[in-house]
């Protein structure tokens, strides 16, 4: 294989010694190399995309490194000169262009694709550590650029402060990063919390805001708040559970598995747990009994910080010695419901499900009967 690319040149030289033999050898060597080139290409064709990708990374790294004040990678780009300048030769040419077809024929005759591919591959293998450094260089710059662009889209953000002496989280003006015109909340999560409140009052969004910002704080040192002091930890959630027809799990079974996963977490590192509408998939009596038991169990784990949301006001009373009660509420006026989405101390003292029947134009008979049923239950 080493001599094959030179056969057409050698046979062409023979023409000047013996024209008939030389021409015959030249044609045979050209035909042989064309067939051999096409056959060999199948063995490395799948790797061409990786070669092109690595070459583009090297080109971008080299270009960026030449920018004034740009950080310099630990890469000697001279060692990859062949890869940066000649990888494009390996690209497919346009079969409808006569000039391109001539180039393709020359490449086949002299096996240029095969020679270049293995030359570039050898340089990558020889200088693998520097190639990895270039990938890391581009990845780091891309990460910083993406983070800077993300921060520019935020109306309010800050870098989190780590305080290992703080057993929870303290934040000001925290918002959900994916909600436009989100309502900000101030809070200190120093104890386990039980959230109560009406439907759509903001319980779930508040928990998601905290959970997402803990992850953002750990991942990109950016939170959507004006202040965020926390002890780093791992986030576990049991939210938005759903039944699974394929596996045969009912909603309640899916919820059980989700909460069991949290219960079995070892108590050897900081854990932040968020449980939304705990055990809502079963009847009221057993839901309250099971919820009290699970939340009491989690309370005993010293490294856990738990925020659980429920519609069961009774649960707030049962857990008042272990969990601090907070709530969200609403105001109903003139058949309109208004939420301020602000967290408040204490358990909820309002309910809106029946009033929502009226506001959403259910038949008056249904609304009145539901209202009359409340004292009887």
Task: List where the protein language model places each region.
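Alpha-helical coupling/stalk and coiled-coil linker elements that connect catalytic or binding modules
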Residues: 1-198, 206-207, 211, 217-234
